[in-house]
Amino acid sequence: MSTPSVQTFGKKKTATAVAHVKAGKGLIKVNGAPITLVQPEILRFKVYEPLTLVGLDKFQNIDIRVKVSGGGHVSQVYAIRQAIAKGLVAYHQKFVDEASKNELKKVFASYDKTLLVADSRRMEPKKFGGRGARARFQKSYR
């Protein structure tokens, strides 16, 4: 029989990250590379947020593998952190107990709601008569 696992996803704009969480020995990989190599370096701590919020002891006995595609660098980082947080909550709900799941959800929600809930904002399409969605070209009366 295969090891018990859960699959969750995180989204930001057009970036999608799929996380597979299963029992293991504490490996966390993003697109096959360790989480310590996530680029850009400035946003690496954003990916670490779910880990630091609940403590590394919760990650000692699970492996997380994340595949991310689409979007830009920043969107991918936010999708990764959401997938990891949702994966941890789903794993605790399915294989640990309800109390620890509720505790994790409370910690994540109090820190940043987007760790568990997707940001639904999208880019507004450009219209004619201006440079962007709302900006208009300057009007001259003479």
UniProtKB/Swiss-Prot annotation:
Alphabetical GO biological process terms = maturation of SSU-rRNA from tricistronic rRNA transcript (SSU-rRNA, 5.8S rRNA, LSU-rRNA); translation
**What family is it from?**
Belongs to the universal ribosomal protein uS9 family.
Q: Which UniProt keywords apply?
A: Ribonucleoprotein, Ribosomal protein
NCBIfam families per record: PRK00474.1 (NF001749)
The gene coding this protein: RPS16
Q: Does the keyword Phosphoprotein apply?
A: no
Q: Name one GO molecular function term.
A: structural constituent of ribosome
Q: Which Gene3D superfamilies match?
A: 3.30.230.10
A Pfam family assignment: Ribosomal_S9
The molecule here is called Small ribosomal subunit protein uS9
Matching InterPro entries: Ribosomal_Su5_D2-typ_SF (IPR020568), Ribosomal_uS9 (IPR000754), Ribosomal_uS9_CS (IPR020574), Ribsml_uS5_D2-typ_fold_subgr (IPR014721)
Which organism does this record belong to?
Answer: Debaryomyces hansenii (strain ATCC 36239 / CBS 767 / BCRC 21394 / JCM 1990 / NBRC 0083 / IGC 2968)
For this record, the Gene Ontology CC terms, alphabetical, are: cytosolic small ribosomal subunit
- PROSITE patterns from the xrefs? RIBOSOMAL_S9 (PS00360)
